Amino acid sequence: MSDKVENVSLMTNSIGNNGNPFGSADYYVNKDKILNTGLEVWEYEGGYSYHGKSILIDDNISVIGSFNVDMRSVYLDTELMLVIDSREINSQLNEAMESYEHIARKADADGSYDNPYDVEPVELTPYREKRMKLIKNFILWTRYLF
C-alpha cells in the first residue's frame, strides 16, 4: 500500500512503552517486516500505553473505533469502527493524532531513529525485557489460536 499511496504512517507503542506484553513481543519479532513495508512508523514514548485506533484517508474520511486490525478482532471480539465523511472531523482528528506524534520517535528500517521532537525513549526495564523474551520464545506462536 505504501508504494501506491503517499504519506502512510503508523503509530504504535515503543517496545519499552508498551503496556501489553504480547503486543510488545509481537512488535519486537515483526518490527523489521513492518518497517520494510515502506510505512512511516512512529513509536509512541508517552510513558503510558497508546491505545488509539484511528485512520485518516485524504482530507475528509475519518475511521475511529475499537477494532484492533487483527484476527482476534475479526473473528472473536465484538469490535467496531465508525467511518465519517467530514472535513471538519478529519481536521480535528488529524490535530489530535499529530499531538501524539510529538511524543514519538520515527523508527527507520536500518534500526536508527529520527527524533525531530527530541523525545526521551521509555526504558525497557530488565523485568519487562525478560517477560517479553519469554513470550516471544515460548508463547507467541499460540497467538493464532485465540
Predicted regions and their residues:
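PLD/PLD-like phosphodiesterase catalytic module centered on the HKD motif
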Residues: 1-146
